[in-house]
Amino acid sequence: MTERLAGKTALVTGAAQGIGKAIAARLAADGATVIVSDINAEGAKAAAASIGKKARAIAADISDPGSVKALFAEIQALTGGIDILVNNASIVPFVAWDDVDLDHWRKIIDVNLTGTFIVTRAGTDQMRAAGKAGRVISIASNTFFAGTPNMAAYVAAKGGVIGFTRALATELGKYNITANAVTPGLIESDGVKASPHNEAFGFVEMLQAMKGKGQPEHIADVVSFLASDDARWITGQTLNVDAGMVRH
């Protein structure tokens, strides 16, 4: 594996476990200095320690503007600013439509969509202030295309992330900052393993062109590509990484 991201600094949110941790590990293997951020401070520290000397842990709550401001101030002091932003942090609820109330809706939108905006606002401002070309890669979900049941607020938020990514590409292209989204399908992450709805995942596999459960590393590989110079002419796109569940 070549260090194609040597000299770059990447921030990965929600990186204490699962897909986020795999992305952080892959970007570090590619040579980047990686900021492992998570609301779970101890989890972030453990993940950074497992990745090695290229990783630094900084706890943050992406839905709290003050916490995000402090996060980027610390990144600026440590590294001089980011080149790559991976918006991975989110919460994944399974709630039947009849049980979706306004508090639930606001909580999911605040973290999964507004939190993505808060971090992206701060991250791209930091890139622009340094005059850096940059990468913004947001982890959305193929549930947006599938209209997955029992996840109405989550589906809406992730659809918003896809729309936001397209608009962001238009706004930031003139600064050589690209914006793309990745939509995972069924991934054997910590959340999936712990889900009380595990029995439903067999049906998801039936819809896939390729059988089996994806691994967090499958998403990390795609993010690695989008973060690299190989993807310098790709922006405003959404890449489905779901074994062909969504085909269009």
Curated annotation (Swiss-Prot):
GO annotation, biological process? vitamin B6 catabolic process
Q: How does activity depend on pH?
A: Optimum pH is 9.2. Retains 66% of maximum activity at pH 8.6 and 57% of maximum activity at pH 10.0.
What pathway is this protein a component of?
Cofactor degradation; B6 vitamer degradation; 4-pyridoxate from pyridoxal: step 1/2
Q: Which UniProt keywords apply?
A: NAD, Oxidoreductase
Enzyme class, UniProt record, top EC level: oxidoreductase
Q: Which GO terms describe its molecular function?
A: pyridoxal 4-dehydrogenase activity
Give the EC number(s) listed in the UniProt record: 1.1.1.107
Domain of life per record: Bacteria
Q: Which SUPFAM superfamilies match?
A: NAD(P)-binding Rossmann-fold domains
Residues annotated as binding NAD(+): 11-35
Q: Where is the active site?
A: Y154 (proton acceptor)
Question: InterPro entries, alphabetically?
Answer: NAD(P)-bd_dom_sf (IPR036291), Sc_DH/Rdtase_CS (IPR020904), SDR_fam (IPR002347)
What does the record give as the reaction this protein catalyses?
Answer: pyridoxal + NAD(+) = 4-pyridoxolactone + NADH + H(+)
Report whether Nucleotide-binding shows up as a keyword of the record: no
Which Gene3D superfamilies does the UniProt entry name for this protein?
Answer: NAD(P)-binding Rossmann-like Domain (3.40.50.720)
Temperature dependence, free-text field: Optimum temperature is 50 degrees Celsius. 37% and 33% of maximum activity is seen at 30 and 55 degrees Celsius respectively. Stable for 10 minutes at 45 degrees Celsius or lower, 76% of activity remains following 10 minutes incubation at 50 degrees Celsius and 1.3% of activity remains following 10 minutes incubation at 60 degrees Celsius.
Q: Which residues bind substrate?
A: S141
**Per the record's keyword annotation, is Acyltransferase included, yes or no?**
no
What residue range is the signal peptide? none
What role does it play? Answer: Involved in the degradation of pyridoxine or pyridoxamine (free, phosphate-unbound, forms of vitamin B6). Oxidizes pyridoxal to 4-pyridoxolactone, but does not have activity toward pyridoxal 5'-phosphate, pyridoxine, pyridoxamine, pyridoxamine 5'-phosphate, 4-phthalaldehyde, 2-nitrobenzaldehyde, pyridine, formaldehyde, 2-carboxybenzaldehyde or sugars.
Q: How does it assemble?
A: Homotetramer.
Q: Which family does it belong to?
A: Belongs to the short-chain dehydrogenases/reductases (SDR) family.
Listed PANTHER family: DEHYDROGENASES, SHORT CHAIN, ESTRADIOL 17-BETA-DEHYDROGENASE 8-RELATED
Mind telling me what this protein is named? Pyridoxal 4-dehydrogenase
Q: Which organism is it from?
A: Mesorhizobium japonicum (strain LMG 29417 / CECT 9101 / MAFF 303099)
